[in-house]
Amino acid sequence: KNLVSDIKQRDIRMVYFAARGTSDHASIYASYLISTYVGVPTALALPSVVTAYDGKLCLKDALVIGVSQSGKAADVLAVMEKAKQCGALTVAVTNDLQSPMAQFGDYHLYCNAGLEESVAATKTFTSQMYVLAMLAAVWGDNEAMLAKLDEVPGAVEQLLSYIPHDIEKIIQRYRYMENGFVLSRGTSMAIAFETMLKLQETNYVKMKGYAVSD
């Protein structure tokens, strides 16, 4: 709530997300929510604009959110540093309270997911989406969304009680798959891209995420 109060006092006109990989997909999800329910335009940063080209960015009236489960992504931190030089309000979303990004941001949104033991980040992706959805809901004074977010832990617990069995039933069909597509649209595009990435990382198959509208 302190962050949202600061945002409203500053008259933020754009949200600029800096992230890589899985965290980039969580940022896509947040972009849809903030654009839709808050009404503020969003953009995904191209970190190389800062790290490779030292590009000029005008982010004075922007909220710049760096997303990284470890909080140690050097290029994401570089974008946050550039943004702060421009006078932007900076926020870090990480799973490490002592990380460089957590220490640098004007605000830190802690995922509090515990140690991420999977190389292909899983629970930290889910927690990033949850934290960013909470930001969108509070910023947009969306009581209905906040109520739905309160239901998430119970829904996840219920899902985990039966989903492994369902996966066992369908997995045989795809055992020898060499490539595939993950189709979606809207907020679920973040899930499509993340599913694509996870299948590539863990099974070494060629995958592509597409919006069905394309």
Residue positions per predicted region:
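Short, Φ-rich (hydrophobic/aromatic) sequence segments
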Residues: K1, E151-L159
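Flexible, glycine/charged-enriched surface loops at secondary-structure junctions
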Residues: A144-L149, H165-I171, G209-Y210
